[in-house]
Curated annotation (Swiss-Prot):
Record: glycosylation sites: 25
Tissue spec. comment: Isoform 1, isoform 3 and isoform 4 are expressed in keratinocytes and tumor-derived cell lines.
Species per Swiss-Prot/TrEMBL record: Homo sapiens
Gene Ontology CC, one term: extracellular space
Propeptide positions: 24-39, 90-160
Subunit structure: Interacts with the PDZ domains of MAGI3, SDCBP and SNTA1. The interaction with SDCBP, is required for the targeting to the cell surface. In the endoplasmic reticulum, in its immature form (i.e. with a prosegment and lacking full N-glycosylation), interacts with CNIH. In the Golgi apparatus, may form a complex with CNIH and GORASP2. Interacts (via cytoplasmic C-terminal domain) with NKD2.
Stretches in topological domain Cytoplasmic: 125-160
Keyword Hydrolase: no
Name this protein carries in UniProt: Protransforming growth factor alpha
Alphabetized GO MF terms: epidermal growth factor receptor binding; growth factor activity; receptor ligand activity; transmembrane receptor protein tyrosine kinase activator activity
Length: 160
């Protein structure tokens, strides 16, 4: 059985279509560029020199898919070209600085009170011979200490 010209044409067309399908599904690159993973391809490029002053208070980035520049604004600025000051950000930053300052001041005062308290406790417990501590203790000393036959801390007298 000899194939007809129509059958040969269909066979050749099938081979060409199979080859085209194989090329479309191929993972090998058709160009000389190395393959790039999808996660590495960025949606942004650096702006061309013609757009270096596009953003007023920010960094210019070029959107690849939309083929137009966009801005990444510095802190405290908003807008398409970072042209507006963000007053809420300025107020929030100021309030944050005030809160930090207040926290530092309160911490320093609390630390000073703690140190003074520790010094007073040490002075009054260990060094009762200190005149200032003795005056402080004697002011708060109860007379019952004198009545029980103990030595008073303020006077070296013993009550019998």
């Amino acid at each position: 059985m000899v194939p007809s010209a129509g059958q040969l044409a269909l066979f050749a067309l099938g081979i060409v279509l199979a080859a085209c399908q194989a090329l479309e599904n191929s993972t090998s690159p058709l160009s000389a560029d190395p393959p790039v993973a999808a996660a590495v391809v960025s949606h942004f490029n650096d702006c061309p020199d013609s757009h270096t002053q596009f953003c007023f208070h920010g960094t210019c980035r070029f959107l690849v898919q939309e083929d137009k520049p966009a801005c990444v604004c510095h802190s405290g600025y908003v807008g398409a070209r970072c042209e507006h000051a963000d007053l809420l950000a300025v107020v929030a930053a100021s309030q944050k600085k005030q809160a930090i300052t207040a926290l530092v001041v309160v911490s320093i005062v609390a630390l000073a009170v703690l140190i003074i308290t520790c010094v007073l406790i040490h002075c009054c417990q260990v060094r009762k011979h200190c005149e200032w501590c003795r005056a402080l203790i004697c002011r708060h000393e109860k007379p019952s200490a004198l009545l029980k036959g103990r030595t008073a801390c303020c006077h070296s007298e013993t009550v019998v």
